[in-house]
């Protein structure tokens, strides 16, 4: 596997983060599609699944699956180097000028403001929203019942949202080319009663189906 000095990787992330734009490249009312991307690992391979949904109807119109060799080890906060290119390869054929991307991974709510969603945004020059089930970075400050701001100092870098009655919050942050408030609004508009927004939930379901097909003895449900 490719090995690099962690200080050099941090420098790359910090340099990329300086290119982040926290303004809407596409007004939400002009969005026509949302693409969700999710990934899973089988031994030394990564399965990347992307689904394209109409917006705001949230109907699946296309999907893509890529299986590639893993070329980088698992290191927390450096997942963009492990998962970034495979995710880009799965998504790039589904996005157009009226599409945003939802990523199972962090955006700027990351110690160096450069999570997986940020990497994908900057590579494809498309708006991305990062969605995670755990808080990686940022102080939570309650805004209202079930909603918290994620702060880095005094700056809002995302939100934590209790997306269904009995679930723990999800963590939402822009990757690039979308504001934190628009990332929250888009996420809310993609919810259909489940913890995860539909683009991520359906991509996750597809990923599990593909993984089962590739590993017949898997107990994955």
Swiss-Prot record:
Q: Which InterPro entries match?
A: Endonuclease-V
The protein's annotated catalytic reaction(s) are:
Endonucleolytic cleavage at apurinic or apyrimidinic sites to products with a 5'-phosphate
Keyword Metal-binding recorded: yes
UniProt GO cellular component terms: cytoplasm
Q: Name one GO biological process term.
A: DNA repair
State a single Gene Ontology molecular function.
RNA endonuclease activity, producing 5'-phosphomonoesters
Give all cystine bridges in this chain: none
Q: Give the protein's cofactors.
A: Mg(2+)
Q: Which residues are involved in binding Mg(2+)?
A: 38, 104
Which family does the record claim for this protein?
A: Belongs to the endonuclease V family.
Q: What is this protein called?
A: Endonuclease V
The species this protein was found in: Archaeoglobus fulgidus (strain ATCC 49558 / DSM 4304 / JCM 9628 / NBRC 100126 / VC-16)
Taxonomic lineage: Archaea, Methanobacteriati, Methanobacteriota, Archaeoglobi, Archaeoglobales
